Amino acid sequence: EVSRALGVLSNKTPAALKVAVNTTARQTRKLMLTEVKNRYDLNAAGRRMIEDLRQRQRATNRHPTAILAIMKNDPGAFRADLGYFRTSPTKPFMGPSVRNAPPVFQAHVLKDSPMIGLSGTGERSKGFLVQFKSKHIGMVQRQLGVPADKDYTESGKERWKPNEKLVTMSSPSGSAMHHTVWEMQETTVEQMLQDNTERRIRQLIANAKRKGVI
């Protein structure tokens, strides 16, 4: 179809497709990031995490295929914790400041969903924020009755008793969020590719006419 539209310039088909596909890939990344931010109530760390979506393969004349992906070793490939989303309060209460913590932390994932109190279950404690050695702030729960692996903090202080194992409160990973949004925007991207291809065809024909080739 592209070759037919180009007519005597049909030899430009691979180059036309390459430009159209790479343009669409760049536009798609921007679209995906915007839609993820519109759908999910991410905090600053969460917004950085979803930026792992990048163009991993550029289209060429020989292979007119571009790939957008979060790679398996990127932070965004792993199941995220609730600490990447909106929480109330937004800061951890650790050490002596624990006495100032609210009775229950609240959080949600989707912007159009209500904040939910993280009151815990029979096997797990209430959810609360902690800052890890890596400086990441995550939402965790204590696994009641299961002893922690370490009895001392990184600074060498003995942990309070009972010292129970911490587990992360999970939420969608960057990959999962982009996958959900892709299913919602696939038709839009197909139209973008068609528009970019037609635009590139018009440009090539106009350039050829200006040079007197056709």
Language-model segments: what does each one mean?
Residues 1-214:
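Short, Lys/Arg-rich flexible segments
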